[in-house]
Amino acid sequence: QLLGQPNAVNAYIECCQRYVGKQKTALIWEGKNGESEQWSFEQLDVASAQLANYFKSIGIQVGDCIAGLLPRTPELLITILATWRIGAIYQPLFTAFESKAIEHRVLTANTKLIVTNAEQRPKLNHVEVKHILTVNAGTNLASNEADFWQEAKQQSDQCEAVLRSFDDDFLMMFTSGTTGLARSVPVPLKAVLAFKGYMQHAVDLREDDSFWNLADPGWAYGLYYGITGPLSLGHSIIMDERTFSVDHAVEVIKKYRVSNLTGSPTAFRMFFGFKEKFDPSIKTHLRAVSSAGEPLTPEVIHWFNNDLNVNIYDQYGQTEMGMVIANHHALDHEKKVGSAGFANPGHRFAVLDANYQEVKYGEIG
């Protein structure tokens, strides 16, 4: 269930405000230099209000696009929540993108503001955008640039969320662009309900889980199910700023006694390649593993099932529609190795012909 109604909903309310006052941790952050921080929903409420008020002060309107070119840091999450709070649309920019990929996405989406950091900032030197907000901007700022915290801390910590409808967009995604120019994929607010359903039925996210999604929030799986989905359930998320490595991933899994893990087959194949690093203590807390992106290999499945004593399940989705078919951890149905599973509750799938008519069993569509 969402707190909002079809004609009065806001993703910030669903993913933060509704949990303010419950004294729950929302974000666990592991910094690239060994720092660790924990942010409560109450702290994110204050920080996102201040940033949202700055957005309004520079003329950002309901329905405008704000892009985040940021690593996995607290500022990224604050930017997302502040964007949603004022009824604007958040656009992720993967930090490995070069300037041309950024420019194409920004121009296509008519993005009004890019939030970035000092490390990523040089990529924007030749990108046309009205406003740039930089974390640790320094002193040599462009005429259209401001410093993230310097501006945010000057603002009020009160900001009323703007209510929208289910069909209004709250994310501006793009396809991967592997077969040509990346195409825009606007995501409506009603998708939050589907994201919650996936977390509950397929991932089986429970209140007492320690949850970590390995995927980068610059892409759909990390943003939909590493941020939006779990936060909409009032569940804490782990953000790890470091570049992925098996050694560090094992450290995080052990440090936070991760019980519910999601990621890509690529990451899980890397785990299998260094399986000697997974000591028996991990068996005592790792309960469920979900994989998305491409099929798992039999040897990886066998290793998780038999050596780590945990079920790892294939699941399927796309940027354009989210995760829609899965072997569900929380549902009692047959799990067949090599199969993507069954449609998520609330979904039905069929093969169509060239005229978009459903074909019969055995026919090619």
Map each language-model feature to its residues.
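Conserved pre-ATP/AMP-binding loop-to-beta segment of ANL
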Residues: 23-25, 134, 153-174, 181, ...
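Conserved AMP-binding/adenylate-forming core of the ANL superfamily
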Residues: 27-81, 98-103, 148-150, 187-190
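Conserved AMP-binding A3 loop
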Residues: 37-42, 170-194
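Conserved structural elements of the adenylate-forming
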Residues: 48-51, 166, 185-206, 268-272
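Structural core segment of the AMP-binding/adenylate-forming
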Residues: 57, 78-151
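Conserved AMP-binding/adenylation subdomain of ANL enzymes
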Residues: 193-210, 217-260, 274-275
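Gly/Ser/Thr-rich phosphate-binding loop
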Residues: 258-262, 272-334, 348, 356
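Conserved beta-loop-beta connector loops within the AMP-binding
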Residues: 350-365
